[in-house]
């Protein structure tokens, strides 16, 4: 048995002007890639929506995947009927089987202006039908159940199960960014927020192995695997940082260690960005959350970078960040115990108002170029793909219509 799946794209994609075809093409390719391996076939295509046919047993997995697919506004299982009121009533009657609800509403969207009834007339006729079958009252606001009917040229679609997508732009339409991944709660959320804005994110994790265990590397791998669900193809650079730390510990004032760690991390991330063709860096900083994230310290750290440093969470509080981490599925991994670079030999009383002259004087005593070259040479690069290899080019034979689901 088969089912039909209607996928609607994020509303912002309709506002892209001359670049709109590029954004829509990337969004649709991202949706098709998300559904790879489930036996789906493209039934219909509109500027802002796709209609697929898939096996009934594939629906639960398709639903789970689309809930993580950036660029999707919403999606629904639908029944397709002839563009006829009686056919819609028959489909509604079938959809009502086994359902109970205290209130409902009908929402009609008529793209086919040749259909003899207006959208309000369709809503009234079908609303009276459902009320007669169930006894439930119509409630236009706050209805317990909503049935959406779309009347298209040559067909009508009845949504029987609707779910929200994550929204956002498809990955890669806004360029490439290198994101520093600490293994904590904040940095995976920051990377995700940039993915939602269309950035293709490359992850860089700094680990203290072999000075400490490899636990932080394993956490970074698990987080990268989770984040790959949103981007579908993702690279993770695992950079050994212990040699840099050894030199900083010897030369730097104790209170300045973390500031110097972070400056060297930005330099290494910038070198990776040049290799990757990325135009910006990303961190999970939140202003004032910890000592290293005071305005003075962020200024001192930023001075080491020449690329823009994006901080998507700069105005978020911890509760907001935790809630987002739980929503995107990174929180449980982020709170696992590990030993990360910035906690290694961390000072008991870190500086909160770093003076740039002290930072620069300390760095003048360090073999910066040698340390950067060594860290880059010893790194490991992993690639994650999800849910598999990219799809082939758009299959031929799917019909394309100008007017469709809104």
Swiss-Prot record:
Compartments where located: Cytoplasm
The coiled-coil regions, if any, are none
Pathway the protein contributes to: Cofactor biosynthesis; thiamine diphosphate biosynthesis
EC number(s) on file: 2.8.1.4
A GO biological process of this protein is:
tRNA 4-thiouridine biosynthesis
> What are the annotated GO cellular component locations?
cytosol
Q: Which residues form the THUMP domain?
A: 60-162
- Provide the leader sequence positions: none
Q: Which keywords does the record carry?
A: ATP-binding, Cytoplasm, Nucleotide-binding, RNA-binding, Thiamine biosynthesis, Transferase, tRNA-binding
The reaction(s) catalysed by this protein are: [ThiI sulfur-carrier protein]-S-sulfanyl-L-cysteine + a uridine in tRNA + 2 reduced [2Fe-2S]-[ferredoxin] + ATP + H(+) = [ThiI sulfur-carrier protein]-L-cysteine + a 4-thiouridine in tRNA + 2 oxidized [2Fe-2S]-[ferredoxin] + AMP + diphosphate; [ThiS sulfur-carrier protein]-C-terminal Gly-Gly-AMP + S-sulfanyl-L-cysteinyl-[cysteine desulfurase] + AH2 = [ThiS sulfur-carrier protein]-C-terminal-Gly-aminoethanethioate + L-cysteinyl-[cysteine desulfurase] + A + AMP + 2 H(+)
Pfam families assigned: ThiI, ThiI_fer, THUMP
- Where do the annotations place ATP binding? 180-181, 205-206, 262, 284, 293
Describe the task this protein carries out. Answer: Catalyzes the ATP-dependent transfer of a sulfur to tRNA to produce 4-thiouridine in position 8 of tRNAs, which functions as a near-UV photosensor. Also catalyzes the transfer of sulfur to the sulfur carrier protein ThiS, forming ThiS-thiocarboxylate. This is a step in the synthesis of thiazole, in the thiamine biosynthesis pathway. The sulfur is donated as persulfide by IscS.
The UniProt entry's sequence similarity note says: Belongs to the ThiI family.
Q: What is this protein called?
A: Probable tRNA sulfurtransferase
Q: What organism is the protein native to? A: Thermus thermophilus (strain ATCC 27634 / DSM 579 / HB8)
Question: What gene, per UniProt, encodes this protein?
Answer: thiI
